[in-house]
Amino acid sequence: MEQERRLVPRVPFVASAELLEVDTGTRMNAQVSELSLHGCYVDTLNPLPKGTSVYVKIFTEEYFFETPGIVVYCHAHLGMGLAFHDVKPHFVGVLQNWLMASTAKKSSGD
């Protein structure tokens, strides 16, 4: 059901993530499993509640991305969907490069 509300589809993408819960300052390490220009899905056994404001950092071996976001849905003991907001132009380029690479991998069958 969430996918129907997305502006653009998410693609499979694996990377490390660090989330900072804005209100409490609590940090959590997790793994991203899907990515789009507007958000991502984060695998974690302890997802944050819907509506929680976060600051998310996503890391690959070569690049990183960071932006504020909000939890738009959560699946108990599985993970949560994040929507990005106020993404800086430099980081839009990072997202676009990651998405192009992930789409190319998917097309080539890797």
Question: Where are these predicted regions, by residue range?
Answer:
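N-terminal helix initiation/capping motif
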Residues: 1-35, 96-110
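Short conserved beta-strand and strand-loop elements enriched in small hydrophobics
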Residues: 15-21, 51-64
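Short, solvent-exposed secondary-structure boundary/capping segments
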Residues: 41-44, 77-86
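Short, surface-exposed secondary-structure edge patches
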Residues: 8, 43-47
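Short, conserved beta-turn/loop elements at beta-strand boundaries and strand-helix junctions
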Residues: 22-24, 37, 74-79
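Conserved hydrophobic positions within beta-strands
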Residues: 32, 69-71
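A short macromolecule-binding patch
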Residues: 81, 89-99
